Structure formats: C-alpha cells, structure tokens
C-alpha cells in the first residue's frame, strides 16, 4: 500500500515537472527557434540512422547542412528585434548574442563539407561525427545566450564534452587517444576552476545566479569591492584562459591539434574560441563591472604572453598543425585587445569583425591541410616543398590564407588587424598594440617561410610526397575544395567590403 502511494506521488510529481517544462517550451520556444531547428535536425539524424543503411550516407550530410543553413536563416530574420529575456531569466536574446551564434553556425556549416572526404577515406562513423558536431554547435549557441551561471555551465559542458569526443574520434590512433586524454583532463580542470569562481560570485551576491541580479546582489551586500571579488575574478579568468588557449594556459593546445583528426581541429579552432569569447565578454562586462581595471590588467598580461609565446614557438615547429596551434594562441592575443577596449571605442565591433575574418582564414588553411594530408599522408612542413609545381590551385589557396593570417595587405586579415589595433590605440593601449604589431611582423616570417617552400622548384628540396602527388583538376566536385574556395575568396575580398561589416558589428553592441 505504501509503495502504491509513493508510486502515485512519483507519477504526479513527474507529470507536474513535464507539464511545467512543456509550458516553458510552448511560451518561450519561439525565442530559441534557431536552436530548436538544430534539435529537430539531431532527432532526424538519429531516426534515419536507425532505419537506413550505408547507402543513405549522403542524406546525413544534407540534413546536417540544411538544419544549419535554416538555423542561420532564422537568426537573420530575427535580426534587430528588441532584446528579450526568456525561460524565467535563464536565456537572453539580443543582437550581440546572435552575432556570436551566427559565427558559430557559419563555422559548423563550412566544417561539414570540409569533413566529408576525410570521413570516407578514414572510414569513421558518419552519424556520430555529425551528431557531435551539431550538439557542440547547439551547446555553443546556448552558451552565447545563457543569462545565469547554471545555464552557462551546462551549455559550456555540452560543448566541451562533444569536443572531447570529437578529438578522440579516431580511436585506433594512439596520438588521438593521447590528445583526448590531455584535452579531457585539462578541460575538466579548467571547468572546475571556472565553477569555483562562479561559486564565489554566488555567495558574495547573496545567492543570485542571473548575471544582472549578481550585480544588484553585490551592491546590496556591499561586496563589489571586496577581496572575494578579486578571488572570483582570478578563478574565472584562469578558467576562461584555458578555454581560449591563452598563455600560460595553452599547454594542451598543440598536442590536441596534432593528435586530433584535422577536420575536428578546424572545427574546434574557431567554434571554441567564438563561444568562449561570447562568454568572456558577458561574464567580465556584467558581474565584474566594478572591477574593470583589475580584469583589464589581467587580460593585458595574458594577451602579451599569448602574442609573444604563441608567435615565438610557432617559428620552431615542424608540424603544420602544431604551427597553427601556436599561431592561434597568438591570434587570440590580438582578439583580447577588443575585449579590453570594450564598447566605448568600438572594441567589440573590431573583435567581431576580426573573428569573422579569422574564421575564413583559419578554415581555409585547414581545408588546404586536409586536402594535402589525404593525398600525401603527411603533416610535416618540409613535405610541402614544391607543391606549386604539382597543384598550383592548392598551393596558391594555402599561400593566400597564410598571408591573410599574417596580416599582409590587401587581404582581409590586414584590415581586421588594422581596425583592431586602431581601436586599441584610440583607447590608450599603446604598449599592448605595439606588442601586437611587433608579433604580427614576427608571424609573417614563419608564414612566408612556408610559402617559400610551396613555391620552390628545386628538385633537391622536393620530397617524395610531392613527387608522387596525385595531380587534381582545376575544377572538382570535391566538397573540401568547395569549402576551401569559399574561405579563400572570403579571406581575399572581405577586407575590401569592410564598411558594411563594421556597421553590422557596431549594431550588435549591447
């Protein structure tokens, strides 16, 4: 009898919880419509995988890409709407959050065609790969709009767990397993440190979890200038430093880049940074509003270390992926200038603009590396020598993307860095901008060193990998070449059309 009553109570409680969740989704679902499209795409992928055979593999790519494109379209239709806080204050929708969501969706959309041929050649499980990519994208989108500490943590872990699984997707590769273990341990440690900082904020604000309410709570408890806030700031900055691969919290990055499948590295190298930047701008600008001088100083130190160490260590690398790992550490150091400047001198606008350019430059470079790796089986920089003699299109594409990453005019990277440094100079960050300029010149050296190798025609320098290289036609139906072409064109011409991009970025400021 007692068991029967307890069972009835459990059913009633479960029904109430379900009805409450359904009520929330019914009245707030329109505010997360782009995310709902991705959820529907995930469910559709699972259903087709359970009821189909290997012949239907093209459908998996089509469903994934279509759901991402429709989600982007839904975001664009919602542009310029009034800011809305939904789900009882847990989620915020505004232009600033949506531009980061757009960047994440754009990265994922470009990464899927980049992965098709790689998955077919390595015989990886296609459905699980696409599920992890879409789920990571979903987690990143929720992270961009999360308005309380719990939602931030859940969305961050949703993204992180999928990232760990993707990095170890080639289970038979020992390097991939090693990369996954390092990524998991370092990622788990960084999440723990971040949560420790959140707990300090929660306690000091009197038990508040919403970002704006934390500020009000700190004012009410008179704790906004207490030593506890400094402790919370240090913990959260360290946690964000790990997620952004800022020096000296960058040790995991080169090993994960080298050991993970190249399309996965391409995906993580941009989406993880966009999602973490969306979190950093909001978590530092809102709860730590009264400690702006302190977190500005911390970020300046991390940015200087990242720019110097990232570019110096990149010079010594022999692996293309490790070189790009250290290069990305230097690149994120430049982007931090935009966060420090803030919205007073178009700092956020310059950061968003540069991240858009960085997506095209970085993904274009990785597309070239994926193609070369599939055709030769090597990742060594020396093995790229003489590629221009065998595949001019691939060599020129890689050269343009590297030059854009280095910031040479008239490519997009030059205009992105120019505006970023100009905003920093206007804000009085003279030393930081000077370091950025010097390290940018340094980065051009190792990019040009690779380009010189690509264009060499001396037989004694050409390795057997290039001598036996399979020549590809100028026009190809290869999906990787499609992604590469789009990214190369964007890396070349986006800087010329910078004014409308800047206008859109300036509209996103909250």
Swiss-Prot record:
The keyword Chloroplast applies. The chain crosses the membrane at residues 31-51, 59-79, 99-119, 124-144, 149-169, 184-204, 229-249, 261-281, 295-315, 323-343, 354-374, 395-415, 418-438, 484-504. Its EC number is 7.1.1.-. It is found in: Plastid, Chloroplast thylakoid membrane. One of its GO terms (biological process) is photosynthesis, light reaction. It is a multi-pass membrane protein. It catalyses: a plastoquinone + NADH + (n+1) H(+)(in) = a plastoquinol + NAD(+) + n H(+)(out); a plastoquinone + NADPH + (n+1) H(+)(in) = a plastoquinol + NADP(+) + n H(+)(out). It is an enzyme of class 7 (translocase). Its main location: plastid. Keywords: Chloroplast, Membrane, NAD, NADP, Plastid, Plastoquinone, Quinone, Thylakoid, Translocase, Transmembrane, Transmembrane helix, Transport. The keyword Cell wall biogenesis/degradation does not apply. PANTHER family: NADH DEHYDROGENASE. Belongs to the complex I subunit 2 family. HAMAP family: NDH1_NuoN_1 (MF_00445). NCBIfam families: NDH_I_N (TIGR01770), PRK02504.1 (NF002701). This is NAD(P)H-quinone oxidoreductase subunit 2 A, chloroplastic. It comes from Saccharum hybrid (Sugarcane). The gene is ndhB1.
